[in-house]
A protein has these predicted regions:
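Alpha-helical transmembrane segments at the extracellular/periplasmic loop-to-helix junctions
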Residues: 1-27, 53, 70, 121-135, ...
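Contiguous transmembrane helix-bundle modules in multi-pass membrane proteins
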Residues: 31-187, 555-599
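Extracellular ligand-binding interfaces
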Residues: 381-449
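Active-site-proximal, structured, solvent-exposed surfaces of multi-pass membrane proteins
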Residues: 404, 426-429, 482-599
């Protein structure tokens, strides 16, 4: 049972109703009261503090409190049933049942007290029904002799039925899909057909971006393509770190999604194609349509990089995390850095390219659903309605050069922290839409947003998404950079050919035409299990650019092999075998003792 009063805050009461009875019973019983209070507080502490759950999933920067909850629940429920079955203390059971009833009633009242929660009344009724069954069974088991004889089996049967019937993670409308739903409703939007069609046309190694949302973040796994999003409770630390450094803000480390955020960033991750839903008008300066399948239009990324590219310059990692999103993208084009190590000094120093700034403040035309005042202090909007925004048309000349890389910079003065959005139009768009929008937060401390945007923009719209007293646009400008000066052309022309990937093995022909070493960045996320060979000789795999694999390439043409193997696999298999053997020996000994007693 999960109480969820706010979208990002969940209070977990229990996975099974039986746990509430167990805790209530041990709290009421004098002999176990102190231990129950201590262990319950300890369980809550372990759930809140991520250390234990991170240890349980063996992944740094990832945690899953459910593992800890389920383990403690199973232990508490088992001890509870054992104690009730052995002692048959009617008074303690009755008092514990009363306390459990009070706790559950208070929990339900708490859930229903929040107006922003739409409680699933059907599931709430089923929860109450199972609670009553447990209550009658536990109280009756200590008072009725015939019921007492089948008490453990009866409780186990009800527990199994509860876990099957209440296949929902919460009392609100967030259900787990069934097999039939997966077949008819989920992962059935044409993406699989488009991916199969594209694979028949181009079987090289690449990632695919999407302009639309499918049912789940693990869409790529289910529909057969290498995507830019995932939802896993055990995301590797390198992926979590990379997304925290470069990706948009998400609910938790379990969610990773780069779709539609930054086409240059996606190119650096090996993205070569974009799937667009019906009617989607991709920015023509960035994407070229190459086919249709499954009701989707397939676009080729004009800025795609080879799946593996060479850096000849290096950054110092210190301070890079404080840069704006725009500058972070520019640093990734112009050079690499070691994620957890100091600058080597073996490469030429990288630097940001020169920029040209063009103000858009004079392009403002109108304000919608708010009042606007335009003076020397900026553009101030007040009296915000349901969808307040300011429109900047006629900006196509500022984004017309395909040989430049463009970014937007917006500086605000706000009465309080707010959510913002910048919509953009490109040629062929009939209006602003959710297909082309950047969302972000503006605070009094962090009042500037900067981001890479595509060429070919014709109009812009700035939205204030939160009801506040006022918002002032202090500065709104285009930042442009010569594409060659950014370092993009160097990466694009990297001598990385004959790329292939199968059975966790990446192979490529890499030509370093300089007299110095270069750093090959392969856009796989770094983990301890990666190993590399150059012309058959083993070399080090480095963690670069906050989580990608890096291999130092000497001068000349080389055959590079990058292979992944699960670390400590042999040790894990050995420990499993030893554990099974110990279990068999202990179990056999107990069987032998019981057999002797029967004889």
């Amino acid at each position: 049972t999960i109480i969820n009063p706010l979208p990002r805050n969940k209070v977990v009461l229990a996975v099974s109703i039986l746990t509430v009875f167990a805790i209530s019973y041990f709290l009421v019983k004098k002999a176990t009261r102190v231990k129950a209070i201590f262990l319950t507080a300890l369980m809550a502490f372990l759930v809140v503090m991520p250390f234990t759950s991170r240890v349980l999933v063996f992944t740094k920067n990832s945690h899953r409190w459910c593992f800890m909850i389920c383990f403690v629940e199973a232990l508490a429920s088992g001890l509870f049933l054992q104690d009730v079955f052995r002692e048959r203390n009617k008074k303690t059971v009755l008092c514990g049942g009363t306390l459990a009833t009070i706790i559950y009633a208070a929990m339900l009242a708490f859930v229903y007290s929040f107006k922003n929660i739409k409680v699933n009344n059907k599931i709430a009724a089923e929860v109450c029904a199972f609670f009553v069954v447990y209550l009658l069974l536990i109280v009756g088991g200590t008072r009725i002799r015939k019921l007492y004889r089948v008490f453990p089996a009866a409780v186990l049967l009800v527990l199994v039925c509860e876990l099957f019937a209440l296949n929902y993670p919460s009392l609100w409308h967030r259900e787990s899909p069934t097999r039939s739903q997966l077949a008819t409703e989920y992962y059935n939007d044409g993406t699989k057909d488009a991916a199969a069609y594209l694979k028949a046309q181009d079987d090289s190694l690449y990632r695919i971006e999407k302009s639309y949302k499918s049912t789940a973040e693990n869409d790529g796994m289910a529909q057969g393509y290498n995507g830019l999003s995932t939802y896993m409770s055990t995301n590797p630390s390198s992926l979590v770190r990379y997304h925290k450094m470069y990706g948009p803000e998400t609910l938790s480390v379990n969610f990773v999604d780069f779709n539609k955020d930054d086409y240059i960033r996606n190119s650096l991750l090996g993205t070569k194609y974009l799937f667009g839903s019906a009617g989607y008008n991709a920015p023509q300066k960035v994407y070229t349509p190459v086919g249709e399948a499954g009701g989707k239009t397939i676009f080729k990324n004009n800025y795609a990089l080879p799946f593996g590219y060479l850096y000849d310059k290096e950054w110092n990692a210190d301070g890079l995390e404080k840069l704006s999103g725009l500058d972070k993208t520019l640093t990734s084009l112009s050079g690499f850095y070691y994620t957890d190590a100091n600058k080597s000094g073996s490469y030429e120093d990288a630097s940001l390219p020169e920029e040209t700034d063009t103000s858009l403040m004079e392009n403002v035309s109108e304000a919608v659903d708010c009042t606007m005042e335009n003076n020397d202090n900026g553009i101030t909007v007040r009296d915000l309605g349901a969808d307040p925004n300011v429109i900047f048309p006629g900006v196509e000349s500022d984004f017309a050069d395909e040989n430049k890389l463009y970014g937007l910079s917006l500086t605000m003065d706000v009465s309080e922290d707010t959510e913002m959005a910048v919509y953009y139009q490109t040629e062929g768009d009939r209006g602003f839409s959710a297909d082309k929008v950047y969302t972000f937060s503006i605070t009094k401390e962090n009042n500037t947003w900067e981001h890479v945007v595509p060429a070919g923009i014709t109009a812009l719209r700035v939205d204030v998404s939160t009801q506040i007293d006022y918002a002032t646009i202090k500065d709104f400008e285009v930042k442009s950079y010569d594409l060659n000066a950014t370092g993009y052309t160097v990466l694009k022309n990297s001598g990385v050919t004959d790329v292939s990937y199968s059975d966790s093995t990446y192979q490529a022909q890499v030509a370093n035409d300089t007299q110095e070493n270069e750093m090959l960045c392969v856009p796989f996320f770094y983990q301890r299990g990666w190993s590399a060979r150059i012309d058959g000789e083993e070399v080090e795999v480095s963690n670069i650019n906050s989580g990608l694999c890096g291999i130092e390439i000497p001068s000349g043409t080389h055959e590079v092999v990058l292979q992944y193997e699960t670390p400590y696999r042999s040790l894990g298999v050995g420990m499993t075998i030893v554990g099974v053997v110990i279990f068999i020996l202990v179990f056999s000994q107990n069987l032998y003792k019981n057999f002797i007693k029967l004889c």
